[in-house]
């Protein structure tokens, strides 16, 4: 596939060539390689507020926000100050700190969870939550949803086979059938498929795990009280509900997705915002369940860098800034971006629907809202790559995949929106002119 490229990406190209000799694919997380859109990945040198600056000096309005955590934009002075103070006092202790207790208090105050365990990544959080659910229920099977991503945990990297509910086939080489043999996958937003799975395996399912709102098949919100119904079905069979709020937690509202639908899941995972953009995450839930964890209980979970004081400082500073007024601004910015994208695509006659889950959004290049992964794949996906690259070449950094969510920060300015509006005009034309290969 051929794409227009910026006139100045020489250093990004040079560093990407070096990286490919040292790192698989030249990146440390696959989506960064621009694999689904083609073209030259940009190497970012620094960022301030709403602006990314690459190694060639090109500036971009940031609509990725490091995949969610940058609520206030990049390098917010209060977060930077908190990190600087923490660094001076030591990088890691391998011992309890006051800060980690205070961060746990912040999480408990804003959500439904009663106790919290800090970990190092969203993957660790979901892996640990599933282990805990299995230990608590003394059951093995788990139920997840097609298109919901929960990190690169072996049992959760699975895609659905044929039928309403089926044992999943592994979705990556290196994951054996045995590792996913207890994983059941059903379509998202399909409550009957969930009921059928529990009817087929009564008393065998340890937990349902779902993104609180889908953000990895594009943006797909739960419909018709879906999460509440999941909780009821799980509890009726003695199973638990895990809601994955790694993406939505403290991003979609002051209380995360819990603030949107008020569903108090048995276990909840957090990441991204909770660490202020540094490598940390958490999971929490009802005290009765959490107390099954070592050293209090028999379910083992540990981490040398868990509760890292620098990451904790960044997370606490970010949550302190994330008051209700901040979400008013972020929601307004998401609405404004939504309108600009839709207006530009409508002007060019491009069939589309802007998918929303609070202030998270994505584009479905087809008429009507998508409610599951099949819906999101049944669109003119070929239109996204030229749309993306035209935005990029006009100074707007959007997610480099049609199946990723767009994020806004409170740092966006009127000038940023003017730049976005101007970039969307040629981008929408490029989408309109795109042809399926």
Curated annotation (Swiss-Prot):
Pfam families in UniProt: Aminotran_3 (PF00202)
A Gene Ontology BP annotation from the UniProt entry: protoporphyrinogen IX biosynthetic process
Entry GO MF terms: glutamate-1-semialdehyde 2,1-aminomutase activity; pyridoxal phosphate binding; transaminase activity
Family label: Belongs to the class-III pyridoxal-phosphate-dependent aminotransferase family. HemL subfamily.
Enzyme Commission number(s): 5.4.3.8
Swiss-Prot/TrEMBL catalytic activity: (S)-4-amino-5-oxopentanoate = 5-aminolevulinate
Main location: cytoplasm
Subcellular location field: Cytoplasm
Cellular component annotations (GO), alphabetically ordered: cytoplasm
Subunit structure: Homodimer.
Organism expressing this protein natively: Corynebacterium glutamicum (strain ATCC 13032 / DSM 20300 / JCM 1318 / BCRC 11384 / CCUG 27702 / LMG 3730 / NBRC 12168 / NCIMB 10025 / NRRL B-2784 / 534)
Cofactor(s), by name: pyridoxal 5'-phosphate
Keywords of the record: Cytoplasm, Isomerase, Porphyrin biosynthesis, Pyridoxal phosphate
UniProt enzyme class: isomerase
Protein name per Swiss-Prot or TrEMBL: Glutamate-1-semialdehyde 2,1-aminomutase
UniProt pathway annotation: Porphyrin-containing compound metabolism; protoporphyrin-IX biosynthesis; 5-aminolevulinate from L-glutamyl-tRNA(Glu): step 2/2
Sites bearing N6-(pyridoxal phosphate)lysine, chain numbering: 272
């Amino acid at each position: 596939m051929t794409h227009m490229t910026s006139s100045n990406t020489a250093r990004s190209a040079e560093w990407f060539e070096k990286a490919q000799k040292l790192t698989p694919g030249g990146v440390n997380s696959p989506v960064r390689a621009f694999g689904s859109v083609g073209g030259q990945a940009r190497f970012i040198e620094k960022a301030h507020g709403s602006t990314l600056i690459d190694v060639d000096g090109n500036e971009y309005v940031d609509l990725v926000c490091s995949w969610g955590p940058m609520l206030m934009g990049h390098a917010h002075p209060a977060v930077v100050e908190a990190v600087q103070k923490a660094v001076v006092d030591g990088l890691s202790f391998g011992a309890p700190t006051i800060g980690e207790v205070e961060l746990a208090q912040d999480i408990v105050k804003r959500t439904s969870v009663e106790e919290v365990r800090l970990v190092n990544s969203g993957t660790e959080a979901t892996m640990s939550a599933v282990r805990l659910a299995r230990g608590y229920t003394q059951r093995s099977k788990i139920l997840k949803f097609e298109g919901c991503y929960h990190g690169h945990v072996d049992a959760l990297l699975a895609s659905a086979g044929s039928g309403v509910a089926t044992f999943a086939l592994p979705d990556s080489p290196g994951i054996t059938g045995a590792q996913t043999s207890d994983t059941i996958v059903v379509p998202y937003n399909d409550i009957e498929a969930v009921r059928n799975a529990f009817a087929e395996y009564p008393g065998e399912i340890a937990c349902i795990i779902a993104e609180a709102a889908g953000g990895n098949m594009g943006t797909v919100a739960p419909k018709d009280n879906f999460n509440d119904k999941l909780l009821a079905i799980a509890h009726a069979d003695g199973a638990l509900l895990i809601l994955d709020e790694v993406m939505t937690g403290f991003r979609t509202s002051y209380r995360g997705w819990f603030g949107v639908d008020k569903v108090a899941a048995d276990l909840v995972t957090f990441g991204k915002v909770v660490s202020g953009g540094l490598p940390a995450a958490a999971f929490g839930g009802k005290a009765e369940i959490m107390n099954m964890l070592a050293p209090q209980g028999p379910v083992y979970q540990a981490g040398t860098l868990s509760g890292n004081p620098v990451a904790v400082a960044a997370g606490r500073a970010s949550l302190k800034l994330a008051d209700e007024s901040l979400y008013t601004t972020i929601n307004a910015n998401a609405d404004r971006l939504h309108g600009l994208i839709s207006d530009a695509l409508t002007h060019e006659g491009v069939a589309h629907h802007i998918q929303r889950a609070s202030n998270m959004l994505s584009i479905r290049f087809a008429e009507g809202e998508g409610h599951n992964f099949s819906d999101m794949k049944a669109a003119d996906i070929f239109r996204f790559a030229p749309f993306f690259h035209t935005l990029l070449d006009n100074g707007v950094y959007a997610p480099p995949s049609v199946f990723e969510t767009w994020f806004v920060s409170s740092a966006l300015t009127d000038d940023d929106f003017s730049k976005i509006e101007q970039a969307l005009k040629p981008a929408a034309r490029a989408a309109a002119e795109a042809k399926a290969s």
